[in-house]
Amino acid sequence: MSTQLEALPYRHVLTLPAMPSAVRTARETAEQALAEWGINPRHPAVDPALLILSELVTNSVRHAAVLSPQVTVIYAAGEDCLAFAVHDRHPYQPPLYASFTGTGTGTGTGGLATVMELTLGLGGTAVVRGDADGRGKSIWITLPL
């Protein structure tokens, strides 16, 4: 799997108002980008990736909108991996791995447990990267293709 996102030849950035309709728009944009990049919609990573993306955008809309009127999604792909990030301007950085026990049952019933179960189950990675000013973050997901 490619390790440097800068090396991924396909990229798309989408910024949306932090409102419920952002979830559907982010997902539909992902479907369009994947099709344009030649990634088969029946690839085993695509449906889980779309669910992960939907959960992350939902979390930004639900929990960060009070401080972040916009959510930005970065889509990227290469020959052997798919990556995306969801960025908002809320400073809270959720402990991604704390939401997942590795037993197939997350510690909670929330979206982050689902995100981590799907990501790790596909052999992917997840990381939270804080903004330099400490007032926002991006959650990056990378999945092998």
Annotated model-derived regions:
Residues 22-23:
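Phosphate/oxyanion-binding active-site loops and adjacent basic polyanion-contact surfaces
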Residues 32-54, 103:
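Conserved short strand/loop->alpha-helix "switch" segment adjacent to the catalytic nucleotide/phosphoryl-transfer site
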Residues 1-17, 61-145:
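Conserved beta-strand-loop-beta-strand hairpin that lines the nucleotide-binding pocket
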